[in-house]
Amino acid sequence: MLKLMNLSTYSYDLERFDFDSQKITDFLEKHYMNGVELLNPIMWEEKILPKKIVKGVHLKYYPTWLDFWNGNRRSLLKQFKSMDAVEKYYEGISRDIMIQHYRKEIETATKIGAEYMVFHVAHVEVEDTYDYKFAYSDAEVVEAGIDLINQVFSGIDTNIKLLFENMWWPGFTMLDKNIAFKLLNRVEYPNKGFMLDTAHLMNTNLYLKDEKEAVEYIINRVEEFGELKNLIKGIHLNCSLSGEYVRSQIKKKNEESEEFDLNPMSEEVFMHVFKIDSHKPFTDNSARKLIEFIKPEYLIYELVASSTGELEEYIETQDRACNFYDI
């Protein structure tokens, strides 16, 4: 099992290490990490992030994309207010912009020599993140996702493991085995499996009270996954107990009468979603039970911290929860 941490090529991540490859390597060694899972690989520079430490790549996630993909201009204008805002969000006006972006990321991942790539099959509109009255079903999102993925991978020369990561928005949630089989059977790329994000699965239950209960919930859901459990190659390990917050937001939204006017690029929306999924560490040693149950090839500490010091604190907290060194 490789123990990894999430890292991106964005300045806010790399400036913590002074854009210095040695400082990044030293940090990984200090915390017994085998490498990183890299976000935004297109901006990768080997002088900062040596190939040997990049074990996985997290492909771009467009939270709101289905109407853009389907060319639904009316719905896009309702959400974004103007086509200029749409173009800014997607960096173009044609679905081909998404296809080409993913192809560039995959080509970079292949050049780096990454062992796996993570892809979210999910969609949510901003208003739906407040009231949970979703515009599309899991099946509709997955149908479009399969179409997108097949176009992205058409003709690409790579054999990196493609791992579908569960979300709590419509799409692949890891709650429906048939959806998982559909992805496996209809995505025309042979080397594929799943990435279990623990917090995302926790977010599908708004009544979890503590980490022990959450771990049991995750294990029960994975048991229902049956034989597909063996295709869970990695775990994004982080904790989310935000059910009370979500329930309060749903109640508040249902009681409001004014028209919803936040757009997908709003800072308020970003902070709202972060309150739902805050990427905090596990603190209870039941986390070890989960790792022993899944037996992943990749264990990624997917944590979000405001400083290097806080990140170290989070890693050490989760190490204690996992009793990692005895596994």
PLM features per residue range, with description:
Residues E91-G193:
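Active-site acidic/histidine proton-transfer and metal-coordination neighborhood
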Residues F17-D26, L76-L77, G92-E105, D138-Q151, ...:
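Well-ordered, non-membrane alpha-helical segments in soluble/globular domains
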Residues K51-R74, A122, L237-S257:
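Short, solvent-exposed beta-strand-terminating loops
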Residues L28-E29, T110, N185, E292:
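Non-catalytic positions within long, well-ordered alpha-helices that form the structural scaffold/packing
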Residues M1-K104, D326-I327:
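N-terminal pre-domain/capping segments
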Residues D13-D20, M33-I48, P63-D67, D96, ...:
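Acidic-and-aromatic substrate-binding clefts and catalytic sites of carbohydrate-active enzymes
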Residues L2-Y10, N34-L38, I53-L59, M117-F119, ...:
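Hydrophobic faces of well-ordered beta-strands that scaffold small-molecule active sites
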Residues L2, I99, G113-E115, Y189-L196, ...:
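Histidine-acidic metal/acid-base catalytic patches
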